[in-house]
Swiss-Prot record:
Belongs to the EfeM/EfeO family. Keywords: Cell membrane, Lipoprotein, Membrane, Palmitate, Signal. A lipid is attached at residue 18 (N-palmitoyl cysteine). GO terms for cellular component: plasma membrane. Gene3D superfamilies: M75 peptidase, HXXE motif. Its main location: membrane. This is Efem/EfeO family lipoprotein. It is a lipid-anchor. NCBIfam families: EfeO (NF041757). It comes from the Bacteria. A lipid is attached at residue 18 (S-diacylglycerol cysteine). PANTHER family: IRON UPTAKE SYSTEM COMPONENT EFEO. It is found in: Cell membrane. It comes from Staphylococcus aureus (strain USA300).
Amino acid sequence: MKKLTTLLLASTLLIAACGNDDSKKDDSKTSKKDDGVKAELKQATKAYDKYTDEQLNEFLKGTEKFVKAIENNDMAQAKALYPKVRMYYERSEPVAEAFGDLDPKIDARLADMKEEKKEKEWSGYHKIEKALYEDKKIDDVTKKDAQQLLKDAKELHAKADTLDIIPKLMLQGSVDLLNEVATSKITGEEEIYSHTDLYDFKANVEGAQKIYDLFKPILEKKDKKLSDDIQMNFDKVNQLLDKYKDNNGGYESFEKVSKKDRKAFADAVNALGEPLSKMAVITE
């Protein structure tokens, strides 16, 4: 009897040991999987850092050309450069929060400054936009504003390598930006003087899509259906924008966009924002 009891005890211990080994193996697999996802997130974030650096580098180069046109009193050239140069900045807007006070210095609208009772501090691209498109003149004030804009663009470019960009900021920033496009930018408030809003919209969508593209391999492992849904909605938004392309590789004036198409675009961006907001699943 004692021998049987000993045998049963040994068997129980052996089974328990095997169970512990299986548990350790499962924990090890989970840990390796988590480490793999973290590595992929880190790689995607690093790639986005590079993308942002490239956009801000081109933004600075374009701003230098834009300011030179202002200095030369070349209004036609300044107007030609204005929407195209701004696209580099607008592609980076999902992480504009990381730009600190340089964002309002470069991109603030007069309405925002008035709301904050800071209109005397207004500077940046939109102030020069007003001079070019509404006041239709380049004077000493415009040239002074252009020099300040260039100074701020250089500072932002220098700051690019130190920006604190993390997956959460990228994901939330892209959702917030598209929500802004669908609810306020769609009214034409962003480019109120030049009506070059479609350039901004395209760049905003491209900036958000870059984030999706970088995280797509991770998302497809977690939720393939969600990934496909996001891609489908990006395609719909881009198709609507393509409708207003001009023959020079740019976009028509926003004034030419019908109310029906403005609503269709806002609806499409909202439809994109809903699944895009679920992309945070990749960090879980």
